[in-house]
């Protein structure tokens, strides 16, 4: 995958959050270096997904795979490291926004266009999704038919890791 400014920025963000968590947990300094090196190797092999709305999730998938290959810890513990690092990040909370901004009706047309475009399957590893209008159970729904993280994990020979990343979808 191309190392665009967006990809590099997201990679740096995830790395800084995880690096701080590794330090809090007493990992050796070279662990963070090993993770970023492995992450770069995975991203170089990763299939292109274009200017996807979920490029940050794709980068997250690569980074989580690298974390699992570098720490010697279980996937569950690596999930906790990643989750806790993100939750401790002030920038993460700013980026996430709140429910009102997420559910802003002005965003719905762009989401519907994204859904329509996703069904064209322009990029093999991109997501395919339907945007569902709210009902009595939820305000806004996403029905994912194909998941870029699942595809990346499959390509990297670790499909079992995708389930941990689904837990980060909040």
Q: What are the functions of these language-model segments?
A:
Residues 1-53, 57-74, 80:
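Sequence termini and other peripheral, non-core segments
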Residues 5, 129-131, 170:
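Generic structural motif
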Residues 27, 73, 156-157, 168:
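Short coil/turn linker and secondary-structure boundary residues
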Residues 59-61, 65-156, 162:
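Amphipathic interaction/junction segments at domain boundaries or subunit interfaces
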Residues 163, 167-170:
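C-terminal structured interaction module
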